[in-house]
């Protein structure tokens, strides 16, 4: 008989069991029963082995690992808290991206923006920041005090110049009638804006100063428009002190000298104002209206000439 793996044959187990029952009901363990009990103990040890994996290596104390459901998981900030932490540039870029992806909300956003009342001082602060950006973009190899910056400086400074001039034009149009009914505030704001443009560093090549000259021409038109509003308002002409208008006229004369006569037309309109008697004010109003008609005709002719010639396509003043 060869080696038999496993339990004994069932016939022999049955015979041994019967023989044991015949001897006083005393259970006599056989070899097969012992072997079966040994395998049962091994299976029990294998079942208990995974339970003891959490036993500490050195301490010998069993600790249960926390269940995943009891851990606190991190989560992103709510929308309101996230927007509170965003800076100005991030909020602006987010709004621009949303309007680009969803053009239907542009009108709603524009309606809300134009309904806001921005102070003149806030506009001036923004213009001064953009003006400083122009000066900071000047290359170190040339000084801006000589007003002879080269072509390399123009290429470096062009984006900052256009950004400043675009912002300046937008703010001016938002602070003149009918957007702003206070003529004194409009004139004062226009005066400061003109000074900012006049003081900008200029370039040695005349064609590189195109944006400056075009902007000053547009400022000249705005000056003439405000002077026209002043001439039509007799209360301002008679009630206000003439020194206020003389101060504006004196400063405008200085700007005209620095701009090579580009502000000559509004300067002549200012000189035609008479702050004397009502009859003098009325006559000055008539002469001013005639000058304004001539000014509009001249402006139209200049625009036609500019359109016929070659102009920069990225100019904000075309």
UniProtKB/Swiss-Prot annotation:
PANTHER family registered for this protein in UniProt: FI02826P (PTHR28032:SF1)
Record protein name field: Tethering factor for nuclear proteasome STS1
GO cellular component, one term: nuclear membrane
Annotated Pfam families: Cut8
Subcellular location: Cytoplasm; Nucleus
Molecular-function GO term, any one: proteasome binding
Keywords on record: Cytoplasm, Nucleus, Protein transport, Transport
Ranges for region Disordered: 1-75
Biological processes annotated in GO: nuclear protein quality control by the ubiquitin-proteasome system; proteasome localization; protein transport
Function statement: Involved in ubiquitin-mediated protein degradation. Regulatory factor in the ubiquitin/proteasome pathway that controls the turnover of proteasome substrates. Targets proteasomes to the nucleus and facilitates the degradation of nuclear proteins.
UniProt family annotation: Belongs to the cut8/STS1 family.
Assembly notes: Binds the proteasome. Interacts with karyopherin SRP1 and Proteasome subunit RPN11.
Biased composition (Polar residues): 11-24
């Amino acid at each position: 008989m060869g080696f038999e793996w496993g339990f004994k044959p069932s016939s022999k187990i049955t015979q041994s069991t019967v023989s044991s029952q015949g001897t006083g009901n005393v259970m006599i363990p056989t070899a097969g029963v012992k072997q079966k009990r040994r395998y049962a103990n091994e299976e029990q040890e294998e079942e208990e082995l995974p339970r003891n994996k959490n036993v500490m290596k050195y301490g010998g104390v069993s600790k249960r690992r926390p269940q995943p459901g009891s851990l606190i998981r991190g989560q992103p900030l709510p929308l309101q808290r996230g927007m509170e932490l965003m800076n100005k540039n991030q909020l602006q870029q987010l709004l621009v991206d949303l309007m680009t992806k969803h053009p239907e909300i542009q009108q709603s956003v524009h309606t809300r923006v134009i309904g806001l009342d921005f102070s003149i001082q806030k506009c001036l602060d923004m213009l001064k920041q953009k003006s400083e950006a122009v000066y900071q973009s000047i290359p170190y190899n040339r000084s801006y005090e000589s007003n002879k910056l080269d072509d390399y400086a123009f290429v470096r400074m062009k984006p900052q110049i256009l950004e400043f001039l675009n912002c300046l034009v937008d703010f001016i149009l938002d602070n003149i009638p009918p957007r702003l009914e206070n003529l004194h505030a409009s004139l004062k704001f226009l005066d400061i804006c003109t000074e900012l443009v006049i003081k900008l560093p200029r370039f040695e090549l005349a064609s590189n100063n195109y944006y400056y000259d075009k902007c000053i021409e547009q400022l000249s038109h705005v000056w003439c428009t405000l002077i026209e509003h002043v001439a039509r308002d007799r209360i301002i002409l008679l009630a206000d002190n003439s020194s206020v208008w003389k101060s504006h006229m004196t400063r405008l004369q200085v700007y005209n000298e620095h701009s090579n006569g580009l502000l000559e037309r509004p300067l002549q309109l200012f000189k035609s104002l008479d702050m004397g008697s009502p009859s003098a004010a009325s006559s000055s109003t008539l002469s001013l209206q005639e000058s304004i008609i001539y000014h509009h005709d001249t402006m139209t002719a200049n625009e036609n000439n500019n359109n016929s010639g070659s102009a920069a396509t990225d100019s904000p003043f075309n």
